[in-house]
Design a protein with these regions (language model features):
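N-terminal Rossmann-like NAD(P) cofactor-binding subdomain of oxidoreductases
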Residues: 2-207, 212-214, 314-317, 353-355
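Generic C-terminal helix-cap and adjacent flexible tail
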Residues: 3-4, 260-263, 347-355
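Short glycine-rich or small-residue beta-strand-to-loop segments that form or flank ligand, phosphate
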Residues: 8-11, 154, 253-255, 324-327
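Alpha-helical scaffold segments in soluble metabolic enzymes
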Residues: 21, 25, 165-169, 222-226, ...
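C-terminal substrate-binding/catalytic lobe of Rossmann-fold NAD(P)-dependent oxidoreductases
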Residues: 33-76, 179-185, 189-324
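Active-site catalytic microenvironments for nucleophilic, acid-base chemistry
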Residues: 169-173, 257, 342-349
Length: 356
């Protein structure tokens, strides 16, 4: 595909929250033609019938949901997005790849390099372990060149995105220790998906904040995998996610130990400059990572509906800790937006296409 080309794309599982966000981004993408959307629940109905907000936008009034069929999908699209639960996505990926179609998978099925780790965290054997060696972890800021040449892209999870982008450059540069990392995340309820589930009903979540998945949330597996790659050694972290009564957004705070002591104001100033330089070198040219100004801290309201991660940090001389905070929209940078960013790299498009 040339830089000026248009690519035909399809979405399997287009009626979920991530699928809906994908539809929104692709309807307005200048070089993507949405040719197929699937949902067993809404077969025969158009996009705008199920999502009235899309009425009058592109093909939304005419494109109908179909039953997911790998043969039909491969015939209709050059690249297929899988917005399906883990365990289900892999079955479609295998057939689509065999048909010569490229796949961007939003599930967890291809994020992990080791099938034994997948089984440990997801409770069942990996459905397509033979594909793991060629799957590329689809975080552009960390794996841009590999994404460009991939057949199978594993779009990262929402929590990992909020944790990895702040921390990976510092580990790689040796500015923080690989031990004792603590990450606490607060997430909106859309992260649980659209399927009705009593713990995530409005009456259960409103006026309430609660932890879940402690001490071994599934996303911990890919977080530790990617941090270990950055550090060049095994990294184990403490991760505690919390559900908060908002629709979308993740705010993550991490507590890290710098490799240098900073017991005096002068030492703190030197370390602060090194941290500033490291993060600037990693992200000053990145379109979707915003390093916030001094005195400004991330706020989920400021990233809602955007593909940006907002990042700030503070040194605490009293405890000897580096505190990093980040905010993302879990459905955009934490899911569909990051997947479209990978599409752009895969096709040689402007990386920001469909994401502004």
């Amino acid at each position: 595909m040339s830089d000026a080309s248009t690519v035909k794309v399809a979405i399997v599982g287009a009626s979920g929250y991530s699928g809906e966000e994908l539809v929104h981004r692709l309807l307005h993408h200048p070089q993507a033609e949405l040719t197929e959307v699937t949902s067993r629940q809404y077969v025969g109905q158009t996009l705008s019938q199920i999502f009235p907000r899309f009425a009058g936008q592109g093909v939304a009034d005419t494109l109908q949901f179909t039953e997911p069929d790998s043969v039909a999908l491969a015939a209709a699209a050059e690249i297929v997005f899988l917005a399906l639960p883990h365990g289900v996505a892999a079955r479609y990926a295998q057939d689509l790849l065999n048909a010569g179609t490229k796949v961007i998978d939003l599930s967890a099925d291809f994020r992990l390099n080791d099938p034994a780790v997948y089984e440990e965290f997801y409770g069942k054997p990996h459905p397509a372990p033979e594909l793991l060696s060629e799957a590329v972890y689809g975080m552009p800021e960390l794996h841009r060149d590999n994404i460009r040449s991939a057949r199978l892209i594993a779009s990262p999870g929402c929590y990992p995105t909020s944790i990895l982008l702040p921390t990976a450059p510092l580990l790689k540069a040796g500015l923080i220790k690989s031990t004792g990392i603590i990450a606490n995340s607060l997430s909106g309820v859309s992260g649980a998906g659209r399927k009705p589930d009593v713990p995530f009903l409005y009456a259960e979540c409103n006026e309430s904040v609660r932890p879940y998945g402690i001490p071994k949330h599934r996303h911990l597996s890919e977080i530790e995998q990617e941090l270990s790659l950055a550090a060049g050694e095994q990294v184990t972290i403490q991760f505690s996610p919390h559900l908060i009564p908002v629709t979308r957004g993740i705010l993550t705070t991490q507590y890290l130990a710098p490799t240098e002591n900073f017991k005096t104001a002068e030492e703190e100033q030197v370390l602060a400059q090194r941290l500033t330089t490291c993060l600037a070198e990693a992200y000053s040219q990145e379109p979707f990572v915003r390093l916030l100004a001094d005195g400004v801290l991330p706020d989920t309201k400021h990233v809602t509906q955007s593909n940006c991660l907002d990042l700030a940090w503070r040194l605490d001389r009293r405890t000897g800790r580096l505190i990093m905070t980040s905010a993302i929209d879990n459905l955009v940078k934490g899911a569909s937006g990051q997947a479209v960013q990978a599409l752009n790299l895969l096709c040689g498009f402007d990386e920001t296409a469909g994401l502004q």
